[in-house]
Regions:
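Alpha/beta enzyme core
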Residues: 2-250, 254-279
Protein backbone atom coordinates (compact mmCIF):
# COMPACT_ATOMS: atom_id res chain seq x y z
CA UNK A 1 0.00 0.00 0.00
CA UNK A 2 1.20 3.48 -0.80
CA UNK A 3 0.49 4.69 2.73
CA UNK A 4 0.86 3.19 6.19
CA UNK A 5 -2.61 4.00 7.53
CA UNK A 6 -3.89 0.42 7.12
CA UNK A 7 -2.64 -2.77 5.55
CA UNK A 8 -5.82 -4.84 5.18
CA UNK A 9 -6.60 -6.07 1.67
CA UNK A 10 -9.78 -5.14 -0.15
CA UNK A 11 -12.91 -7.22 0.22
CA UNK A 12 -13.30 -7.62 -3.53
CA UNK A 13 -12.02 -10.49 -5.64
CA UNK A 14 -12.17 -8.41 -8.83
CA UNK A 15 -9.33 -7.08 -10.97
CA UNK A 16 -6.20 -5.74 -9.31
CA UNK A 17 -6.67 -2.36 -11.00
CA UNK A 18 -9.87 -0.87 -12.40
CA UNK A 19 -9.41 0.70 -15.83
CA UNK A 20 -11.65 1.94 -18.63
CA UNK A 21 -11.57 -1.57 -20.10
CA UNK A 22 -12.74 -3.02 -16.79
CA UNK A 23 -15.57 -0.49 -16.58
CA UNK A 24 -16.66 -1.30 -20.14
CA UNK A 25 -16.56 -5.02 -19.39
CA UNK A 26 -18.74 -4.52 -16.32
CA UNK A 27 -21.55 -3.19 -18.52
CA UNK A 28 -21.19 -6.08 -20.95
CA UNK A 29 -21.16 -8.55 -18.06
CA UNK A 30 -24.09 -6.83 -16.35
CA UNK A 31 -21.99 -6.19 -13.23
CA UNK A 32 -23.03 -3.00 -11.48
CA UNK A 33 -20.40 -0.27 -11.03
CA UNK A 34 -20.05 1.09 -7.49
CA UNK A 35 -18.81 4.67 -7.20
CA UNK A 36 -18.41 7.10 -4.30
CA UNK A 37 -16.78 10.48 -3.84
CA UNK A 38 -13.64 11.04 -1.77
CA UNK A 39 -11.62 14.14 -1.02
CA UNK A 40 -8.82 12.88 1.25
CA UNK A 41 -6.31 10.07 1.70
CA UNK A 42 -7.89 8.18 4.61
CA UNK A 43 -11.41 8.11 3.17
CA UNK A 44 -10.14 7.02 -0.24
CA UNK A 45 -8.04 4.30 1.38
CA UNK A 46 -11.05 2.90 3.22
CA UNK A 47 -13.24 3.00 0.11
CA UNK A 48 -10.57 1.16 -1.86
CA UNK A 49 -10.29 -1.50 0.82
CA UNK A 50 -14.05 -1.98 0.73
CA UNK A 51 -13.97 -2.76 -2.99
CA UNK A 52 -15.25 0.44 -4.59
CA UNK A 53 -14.78 0.49 -8.38
CA UNK A 54 -14.69 4.22 -9.10
CA UNK A 55 -13.71 7.08 -6.82
CA UNK A 56 -14.82 10.52 -7.92
CA UNK A 57 -12.86 13.46 -6.57
CA UNK A 58 -15.91 15.62 -6.98
CA UNK A 59 -16.28 19.37 -6.99
CA UNK A 60 -19.02 18.54 -4.47
CA UNK A 61 -16.15 19.10 -2.02
CA UNK A 62 -17.09 22.77 -2.30
CA UNK A 63 -20.32 22.01 -0.44
CA UNK A 64 -19.50 19.08 1.87
CA UNK A 65 -15.84 19.90 2.60
CA UNK A 66 -15.68 23.70 2.30
CA UNK A 67 -19.23 24.61 3.33
CA UNK A 68 -20.27 26.55 0.22
CA UNK A 69 -23.86 26.51 -1.01
CA UNK A 70 -22.82 25.39 -4.51
CA UNK A 71 -19.87 23.79 -6.28
CA UNK A 72 -19.06 26.99 -8.18
CA UNK A 73 -16.33 28.45 -5.89
CA UNK A 74 -14.07 25.39 -6.20
CA UNK A 75 -10.84 26.07 -8.10
CA UNK A 76 -8.68 23.87 -10.28
CA UNK A 77 -5.81 24.12 -7.79
CA UNK A 78 -8.11 22.87 -5.03
CA UNK A 79 -9.24 19.91 -7.13
CA UNK A 80 -5.63 18.98 -7.84
CA UNK A 81 -4.70 19.29 -4.16
CA UNK A 82 -7.48 16.94 -3.04
CA UNK A 83 -6.91 14.50 -5.90
CA UNK A 84 -3.27 14.06 -4.92
CA UNK A 85 -4.27 12.95 -1.44
CA UNK A 86 -6.93 10.58 -2.74
CA UNK A 87 -4.58 8.92 -5.18
CA UNK A 88 -1.99 8.21 -2.47
CA UNK A 89 -4.58 6.12 -0.65
CA UNK A 90 -5.74 3.91 -3.51
CA UNK A 91 -4.41 0.76 -5.16
CA UNK A 92 -7.37 -0.75 -7.03
CA UNK A 93 -10.12 1.78 -7.76
CA UNK A 94 -10.09 4.05 -10.80
CA UNK A 95 -9.92 7.71 -9.79
CA UNK A 96 -11.77 10.39 -11.75
CA UNK A 97 -11.36 14.11 -11.08
CA UNK A 98 -14.12 16.65 -11.66
CA UNK A 99 -13.12 19.58 -13.84
CA UNK A 100 -14.44 22.53 -11.79
CA UNK A 101 -16.51 25.49 -12.92
CA UNK A 102 -14.73 27.77 -15.42
CA UNK A 103 -11.81 25.39 -15.90
CA UNK A 104 -13.21 24.44 -19.33
CA UNK A 105 -16.21 26.65 -20.11
CA UNK A 106 -14.28 29.57 -21.66
CA UNK A 107 -12.95 27.59 -24.62
CA UNK A 108 -12.01 24.05 -25.56
CA UNK A 109 -8.27 24.72 -25.68
CA UNK A 110 -8.20 25.96 -22.10
CA UNK A 111 -10.28 23.01 -20.95
CA UNK A 112 -7.99 20.62 -22.80
CA UNK A 113 -4.88 22.11 -21.19
CA UNK A 114 -6.45 22.07 -17.74
CA UNK A 115 -7.45 18.42 -18.12
CA UNK A 116 -3.87 17.64 -19.08
CA UNK A 117 -2.63 19.49 -16.03
CA UNK A 118 -4.90 17.42 -13.78
CA UNK A 119 -3.58 14.19 -15.25
CA UNK A 120 0.09 15.22 -15.07
CA UNK A 121 -0.02 16.62 -11.55
CA UNK A 122 -2.26 14.03 -9.87
CA UNK A 123 -1.86 10.73 -11.68
CA UNK A 124 -5.65 10.34 -11.90
CA UNK A 125 -7.29 7.85 -14.21
CA UNK A 126 -9.45 10.40 -15.99
CA UNK A 127 -11.54 13.56 -15.74
CA UNK A 128 -15.24 14.43 -15.77
CA UNK A 129 -16.91 17.27 -17.68
CA UNK A 130 -20.50 18.46 -17.27
CA UNK A 131 -22.63 19.05 -20.35
CA UNK A 132 -23.75 17.48 -23.60
CA UNK A 133 -23.41 18.62 -27.20
CA UNK A 134 -21.61 21.86 -26.29
CA UNK A 135 -18.61 19.96 -24.85
CA UNK A 136 -18.43 17.30 -27.58
CA UNK A 137 -15.37 18.80 -29.26
CA UNK A 138 -13.61 19.19 -25.90
CA UNK A 139 -14.30 15.56 -25.05
CA UNK A 140 -13.00 14.48 -28.45
CA UNK A 141 -9.82 16.53 -28.08
CA UNK A 142 -9.20 15.24 -24.57
CA UNK A 143 -9.78 11.58 -25.39
CA UNK A 144 -7.65 11.84 -28.52
CA UNK A 145 -4.79 13.01 -26.28
CA UNK A 146 -5.13 9.84 -24.21
CA UNK A 147 -7.15 11.21 -21.30
CA UNK A 148 -10.22 9.13 -20.33
CA UNK A 149 -13.37 11.23 -19.96
CA UNK A 150 -16.64 10.73 -18.12
CA UNK A 151 -19.60 12.86 -19.18
CA UNK A 152 -22.31 14.24 -16.90
CA UNK A 153 -25.93 14.88 -17.93
CA UNK A 154 -29.16 15.74 -16.15
CA UNK A 155 -28.80 17.98 -13.14
CA UNK A 156 -25.37 19.49 -13.70
CA UNK A 157 -24.47 21.44 -10.52
CA UNK A 158 -22.18 23.89 -12.33
CA UNK A 159 -25.28 25.17 -14.17
CA UNK A 160 -27.34 25.51 -11.01
CA UNK A 161 -28.10 29.21 -11.48
CA UNK A 162 -29.27 28.54 -15.03
CA UNK A 163 -31.61 25.81 -13.77
CA UNK A 164 -32.80 27.88 -10.83
CA UNK A 165 -32.34 25.13 -8.25
CA UNK A 166 -31.56 21.47 -7.65
CA UNK A 167 -34.69 20.25 -9.41
CA UNK A 168 -34.90 17.07 -11.52
CA UNK A 169 -34.03 17.38 -15.20
CA UNK A 170 -35.33 15.57 -18.26
CA UNK A 171 -38.93 15.74 -17.10
CA UNK A 172 -40.37 17.28 -20.28
CA UNK A 173 -40.47 15.49 -23.64
CA UNK A 174 -38.11 18.03 -25.19
CA UNK A 175 -35.60 17.75 -22.34
CA UNK A 176 -35.74 13.96 -22.49
CA UNK A 177 -35.20 13.95 -26.25
CA UNK A 178 -32.22 16.29 -25.94
CA UNK A 179 -30.69 14.19 -23.17
CA UNK A 180 -30.87 11.06 -25.29
CA UNK A 181 -29.22 12.99 -28.10
CA UNK A 182 -26.54 14.43 -25.81
CA UNK A 183 -25.71 10.99 -24.45
CA UNK A 184 -25.13 9.61 -27.95
CA UNK A 185 -23.02 12.65 -28.85
CA UNK A 186 -20.82 12.17 -25.78
CA UNK A 187 -20.41 8.48 -26.59
CA UNK A 188 -19.43 9.30 -30.18
CA UNK A 189 -16.98 11.93 -28.91
CA UNK A 190 -15.18 9.23 -26.93
CA UNK A 191 -16.49 9.40 -23.37
CA UNK A 192 -16.13 5.99 -21.70
CA UNK A 193 -18.95 6.53 -19.18
CA UNK A 194 -21.73 9.03 -18.41
CA UNK A 195 -23.09 10.17 -15.05
CA UNK A 196 -26.86 10.71 -15.04
CA UNK A 197 -28.00 12.93 -12.18
CA UNK A 198 -31.51 13.44 -10.87
CA UNK A 199 -33.52 12.40 -13.90
CA UNK A 200 -36.60 10.14 -14.17
CA UNK A 201 -35.76 6.45 -13.83
CA UNK A 202 -37.59 5.70 -17.08
CA UNK A 203 -35.42 8.18 -18.98
CA UNK A 204 -32.25 6.83 -17.38
CA UNK A 205 -33.27 3.35 -18.52
CA UNK A 206 -33.70 4.58 -22.10
CA UNK A 207 -30.35 6.37 -22.08
CA UNK A 208 -28.61 3.33 -20.62
CA UNK A 209 -30.14 0.99 -23.18
CA UNK A 210 -29.23 3.30 -26.06
CA UNK A 211 -25.52 3.39 -25.20
CA UNK A 212 -22.66 0.95 -25.52
CA UNK A 213 -20.80 2.78 -22.75
CA UNK A 214 -21.98 2.49 -19.13
CA UNK A 215 -24.07 4.97 -17.19
CA UNK A 216 -23.65 5.74 -13.51
CA UNK A 217 -26.68 7.22 -11.80
CA UNK A 218 -27.27 9.49 -8.83
CA UNK A 219 -30.95 9.97 -8.24
CA UNK A 220 -31.60 8.33 -11.61
CA UNK A 221 -33.20 5.05 -10.57
CA UNK A 222 -32.19 1.43 -10.63
CA UNK A 223 -31.62 0.87 -14.35
CA UNK A 224 -28.24 2.59 -14.72
CA UNK A 225 -25.12 0.46 -15.06
CA UNK A 226 -23.81 1.79 -11.75
CA UNK A 227 -24.51 4.14 -8.88
CA UNK A 228 -22.66 7.03 -7.26
CA UNK A 229 -23.30 8.91 -4.03
CA UNK A 230 -21.48 11.59 -2.09
CA UNK A 231 -19.67 9.65 0.61
CA UNK A 232 -20.63 11.97 3.46
CA UNK A 233 -24.30 11.61 2.48
CA UNK A 234 -24.39 7.81 2.48
CA UNK A 235 -22.42 7.68 5.75
CA UNK A 236 -24.90 9.99 7.47
CA UNK A 237 -22.51 12.84 8.21
CA UNK A 238 -24.96 15.53 7.11
CA UNK A 239 -28.21 15.19 9.03
CA UNK A 240 -29.78 18.17 7.28
CA UNK A 241 -29.48 16.63 3.81
CA UNK A 242 -31.73 13.67 3.13
CA UNK A 243 -33.15 13.59 -0.41
CA UNK A 244 -34.95 10.40 -1.27
CA UNK A 245 -32.19 9.14 -3.58
CA UNK A 246 -29.73 8.93 -0.65
CA UNK A 247 -29.66 5.80 1.51
CA UNK A 248 -27.87 6.18 4.84
CA UNK A 249 -25.64 3.15 5.43
CA UNK A 250 -24.42 4.65 8.72
CA UNK A 251 -25.17 7.57 11.01
CA UNK A 252 -21.67 8.82 11.66
CA UNK A 253 -22.73 12.29 12.78
CA UNK A 254 -24.22 10.73 15.92
CA UNK A 255 -21.18 8.50 16.42
CA UNK A 256 -18.75 11.41 16.07
CA UNK A 257 -20.67 13.67 18.45
CA UNK A 258 -20.91 10.93 21.06
CA UNK A 259 -17.23 10.02 20.75
CA UNK A 260 -16.05 13.63 20.99
CA UNK A 261 -18.34 14.26 23.98
CA UNK A 262 -16.80 11.27 25.77
CA UNK A 263 -13.31 12.54 24.97
CA UNK A 264 -14.11 16.02 26.27
CA UNK A 265 -15.57 14.53 29.45
CA UNK A 266 -12.53 12.31 30.04
CA UNK A 267 -10.11 15.21 29.53
CA UNK A 268 -12.07 17.51 31.84
CA UNK A 269 -12.29 14.82 34.54
CA UNK A 270 -8.60 13.93 34.12
CA UNK A 271 -9.46 10.38 33.03
CA UNK A 272 -7.41 10.71 29.85
CA UNK A 273 -4.60 9.93 29.51
CA UNK A 274 -3.97 7.22 32.10
CA UNK A 275 -0.68 5.51 32.93
CA UNK A 276 -0.86 2.92 30.13
CA UNK A 277 -1.35 5.73 27.61
CA UNK A 278 1.76 7.54 28.82
CA UNK A 279 5.48 7.06 28.09
Amino acid sequence: MKGSFMKNSTTTSGPKKVTTKVIAAMKKGKTRIACLTAYDYITAHLLDQAGIDLILVGDSLGMVFQGHETTLPVTLDEMIYHAKGVIRGVDRAMIIVDMPFMSYQANDEEGFRNAGRVMKETGAGGVKFEGGERIANLVHMTVRAGIPVIGHLGLTPQSIHQFGGFTPRGVTPDEAKQMLRDAKILEEAGAFCIVLEKIPASLAAKVTKSLKIPTVGIGAGMHCDGQVLVVSDMLGLNEDFHPRFVRHYAHLSETIRRSVSEYVKDVKEEKFPVQKESY
